[in-house]
Amino acid sequence: MAIINMTDLDLTNKRVLIRQDLNVPVSDGMVTSDARLRASLPTIQLALDKGAAVMVMSHLGRPTEGEFNNEFSLQPVVDYLAKALKSPVRLATDYLDGVEANVGEVVVFENVRFNQGEGKNDEALSKKMAALCDVYVMDAFGTAHRAQASTHGVGMFAPIACAGPLLAQELDALGKALDNPARPMVAIVGGSKVSTKLTVLESLSGIVDQLVVGGGIANTFIAAAGFNVGKSLYEADLVDEAKRLVANARSRGGDIPVPTDVVVASEFSPTAAAKLVDVSQVSDTDMIFDIGPDSAEALAKIIETAGTIVWNGPVGVFEFDQFGKGTERIARAIADSKAFSIAGGGDTLAAVDKYNIADKVSYISTGGGAFLEFLEGKELPAVAMLEKRGA
């Protein structure tokens, strides 16, 4: 990929506009989870260290486009950055027709979604943004799958468009996992529905040596194997699709293993009594909420021998501890593995946090939808734009 990297550029006295993902939860004017902000700090600091006048933009939440709404203002983010950085930080609310930005300071543009035309990648808006800078830096992998004015259009018209360090790291890690993976390659795909992950399953089943399914997705594969799933969440209309995926995997010498034992309950609640049963003994009133210890150990053995691991989604309802043992065993196996491992997706990151294995995973992807679309083999518009500008 012929993408220009920000790290390679001379930014002395340059006006540098960085698109970051500063979309964080805010309550009573305070940032309540700062993971994305912490991840963004090194890029801002690097631009400052390189002698640039730094401008930063992001979206926050889902306001009505084109309308200011104080609930979605980036002011709490500015307050956070002002404390975290040793440089002056200020918010610019009216910036499209020009903004003063001095070397050594950070100007944060108000929520890009307050601009009419942001979502539609409006050309006039994109050109106005591009006119504000000498260098545009795309550093928000989490929004790279959206062709919008602040993630795509501006980069088409800016004098120089490049990838920031966060985006470059993400693309390197995903490339390492998918383009030329160390074998055997194992993918763990969980979540509630096959329908939302069907293209991911199809794409991965063609490149991995072992595809492991969990959560509600696994229930559809259990049904496809001819077992009763009781009242469990599953998709009857996709049973044939599951059979086809298994047949495809086996024709390549791989497999999509179905659990041999499962943890069931009669209701979905934090206090539901968990019962371990053989997969052939699920009753009509049971709901499957986790894989059993035998299945978890079998999957752990697969993970132990892997060269590359891609993890997207838990294998059970791990939010309730009595249904979390399967996901915990998988998480520990990934943590103990010597393989190159990459984890992504909201629920997956929550599991990584719960079992405290963040420092044992090779790379944690910040992008939810973008991570999935990359796994599906789709072209990400922002990445395509950077490749075009770098060519």
From Swiss-Prot:
Any one GO BP annotation for this protein: gluconeogenesis
PROSITE patterns (alphabetical): PGLYCERATE_KINASE
Instruction: Share what the entry says about its subunit structure, partners included.
Output: Monomer.
| UniProt keyword list | ATP-binding, Cytoplasm, Glycolysis, Kinase, Nucleotide-binding, Transferase
Annotated ATP binding sites: K197, E319, G345, G346, D347, T348
Q: What is this protein called?
A: Phosphoglycerate kinase
From the UniProt record, give the pathway where this protein acts.
Carbohydrate degradation; glycolysis; pyruvate from D-glyceraldehyde 3-phosphate: step 2/5
User: So which domain of life are we looking at?
Assistant: Bacteria
HAMAP family this protein is in?
Answer: Phosphoglyc_kinase (MF_00145)
Q: Which GO terms describe its cellular component?
A: cytosol
- Residues that bind substrate, according to the entry? D21, L22, N23, R36, H59, L60, G61, R62, R113, R146
> Enzyme group, top EC level?
transferase
**GO molecular-function term, one example from the UniProt record:** ATP binding
Entry's EC annotation = 2.7.2.3
- Matching InterPro entries: Phosphoglycerate_kinase (IPR001576), Phosphoglycerate_kinase_CS (IPR015911), Phosphoglycerate_kinase_N (IPR015824), Phosphoglycerate_kinase_sf (IPR036043)
